[in-house]
Amino acid sequence: MRVAVYYAPPPADPLWVAACAWLGWDAERGAAVPQPLPGLAEITAAPRLYGFHATLKPPMRLATDYGSFMDDVARLAATMPAFMLPPLAVMDLSGFLAVRETAPCAPLQALADRCVTTLDPHRAPPDAAELARRRGGGLSAAQDSHLLQWGYPHVLDTWRFHMTLTRRLSAAEQAWVRPAAAGHLASALARRQACTALSVFTQPGPGAPFRVAERVALTG
């Protein structure tokens, strides 16, 4: 099993509902969802596996037990306040489409940093195969250092908030997929989002889709 700590909109929020339909998977219900357009199944296959989310603590195998991990998640959530996110929009991110913030958000960065560092004692180290896979795409010196120390290259100063909507797209695919995604999510993205909880997702085994296991309110 792998666990991850994510930001995810509440299950009744229009953004969650619309994005789950876009991906074809509702990680809260653990159920497939009809997609709004033909041709989406293949280009959303990779993000569908993880569910709609923004990563705070990347997926990891536990070196401890789930109960002690959740105890520390609860303790962390009790020290961090809820906050409003900046307006969000569909953007290109290195060829992928993702929902991203339109302005920097210091509380969001602080929350992600705390999740990475505070929960790291529960992380089992990556094996040689995982290290090789992560390095296969080419990493900067900072990213490689993070990979060795934190098990993932895109954390702390190299972290970027993003809620992935597609695989990497060609220019021709971008030409129709980006406006389709923006249109599908437009009314939901017009509403300001709040970060009010840490969402713990779990993956029971390799290749299985992630599901929401628990949502822990931020009460600091």
Whereabouts are the PLM-identified features?
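Basic, often amphipathic N-terminal segments
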Residues: M1-D92, A106, A110-R192, G205-G220
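Secondary-structure transition/turn motif
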Residues: R100-A106
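Small/polar glycine-rich anion-binding or flexible loop at a beta-alpha turn
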Residues: A194-T202
